[in-house]
Amino acid sequence: MVLDRAKTDRDVYLIFQPGEETGEGAKICSELINEKCIGEIYGLHNIPGHAIGNVLVSGDTFACASTGLEISMHGTPSHAAYPEAGKNPGPVLAKLLLDIQALTQEVNEKEGFVLMTLIGMDVGSASYGVAASEGVLRLTVRGEREAVFDSYLRRINELVVSAAAGEEMSVDIEEIERFPATENHPENVQRLIELSLI
C-alpha cells in the first residue's frame, strides 16, 4: 500500500464506519479512536458524479447537523356534531408548521443556513363520528453550524410549547436520530490540500 511506502512518523489507521445513516457505526469507531488516542480524523466519502481519484475538499461544513422531530399534540375528543366541545390539534399543527417555516426563513436570513422538511402529519383517525383529538407532526431539521442549529431547535421547541399552551393541549417533542454537524478545521483542510498535490 501507499502508506507502507510513505514511511510516516506515526501510526495511521484506516477505519470503515458501518451504520453511517443511523450513527451506530460512530459509536463502534469511537472506542478505537479513544483507545489509540487518535488526534486527527479525515473522512473519505464518495461523491457521485466525480471521477475516481479526484479529491474534493470542503473548507467549511461537510454535513449539516440534523435531527428528526416528532411533535405529538394531545387534545380532547368530542362528537363530530359538537366539535366545539373538544380540542382538535389539527388546526394548531397546521399553523405550527407555517410558523416553523417562517422561523426557518428568518434564521436563514439572519443567522445561517437551516432547513426544515415536512416528513408527515397525522391527525385523528377514520372515525367519522368523532373529532380528532390526537395529532403528530414529523419534521427533519438541519443546520450548517452547530450553534445556529441548537438555537434554531430551542426556538422551534418554544413555538411548539406556546402553540399547545395557547389551546390548552399537552404536547410531547421527541428528537429522533440526531447527528452533529461535520465541520472541518482550516489547518486540516490545508494539510489535505497539500497532500493531494503530491
Name each model-derived stretch.
Residues 6-120, 124-130:
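Histidine/acidic-residue-rich, glycine-tolerant segments that coordinate divalent metal ions
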